[in-house]
Amino acid sequence: MNFRVGQGYDVHKLVDGRKLILGGVEIPHPTGLLGHSDADALLHAITDALLGAVALGDIGRHFPDTDPRYKGADSRVLLRAAVALLAERGWRPVNVDATLIAQQPKLAPHAVAMVANVAADLGISPDCVNIKGKTNERLGYLGREEAIEAQAVALVERVG
């Protein structure tokens, strides 16, 4: 088998006193995401998609929130570490398609920077990374601006 697909998901609560970081981009907003690391839900979902594609579990298995080494960790560092795990096993990312669901803030103005970061971390062209922003039409906890959710799918291929 030369190709595999993985799916990833993450959600974090919005709270006062935290920076909002998505796709490695700091987004101006009065609240940020709560988490052990920088709580970048987008990168966590992408990391899970990549790990899942090669049956390596999920982000919590490799970078547990019980480990003080990952307190406040930059999720871009974790994503690059996941890519290295794939490479050790003979796999590389081909493309990623991700969706961020947030009532606020508007994410489209930050999409180009997020795509550039993800592409750089995965070692692929920006035209192989797609990031979409959606609202939840004011429904549920996402619509009440209590959290931000991320979903991602990744295609990987065997190298060599």
From Swiss-Prot:
Report the pathway entry: Isoprenoid biosynthesis; isopentenyl diphosphate biosynthesis via DXP pathway; isopentenyl diphosphate from 1-deoxy-D-xylulose 5-phosphate: step 4/6
Q: GO biological process: what's one of them? A: terpenoid biosynthetic process
Q: Which PROSITE patterns match?
A: ISPF
Q: What is the free-text note on the cofactor?
A: Binds 1 divalent metal cation per subunit.
Look up the record and name the cofactor or cofactors this protein needs.
a divalent metal cation
Q: What class of enzyme is it?
A: lyase
Q: Which residues bind 4-CDP-2-C-methyl-D-erythritol 2-phosphate?
A: 10-12, 36-37, 58-60, 63-67, 144
Against InterPro entries, the record matches this protein to: MECDP_synthase, MECDP_synthase_CS, MECDP_synthase_sf
Q: Which residues bind a divalent metal cation?
A: 10, 12, 44
> What GO molecular function terms would the record report?
2-C-methyl-D-erythritol 2,4-cyclodiphosphate synthase activity; metal ion binding
The Enzyme Commission number assigned here is 4.6.1.12
Q: Which domain of life is it from?
A: Bacteria
Site positions for Transition state stabilizer, renumbered to this chain? Answer: 36, 135
* Catalysis: reaction(s): 4-CDP-2-C-methyl-D-erythritol 2-phosphate = 2-C-methyl-D-erythritol 2,4-cyclic diphosphate + CMP
Name of one Pfam family that matches: YgbB
UniProt keywords (A-Z) are: Isoprene biosynthesis, Lyase, Metal-binding
What family does this chain come from, according to its entry?
A: Belongs to the IspF family.
**What is the stated purpose of this protein?**
Involved in the biosynthesis of isopentenyl diphosphate (IPP) and dimethylallyl diphosphate (DMAPP), two major building blocks of isoprenoid compounds. Catalyzes the conversion of 4-diphosphocytidyl-2-C-methyl-D-erythritol 2-phosphate (CDP-ME2P) to 2-C-methyl-D-erythritol 2,4-cyclodiphosphate (ME-CPP) with a corresponding release of cytidine 5-monophosphate (CMP).
User: Subunit structure, per the record?
Assistant: Homotrimer.
UniProt protein name:
2-C-methyl-D-erythritol 2,4-cyclodiphosphate synthase
The source organism is: Dechloromonas aromatica (strain RCB)
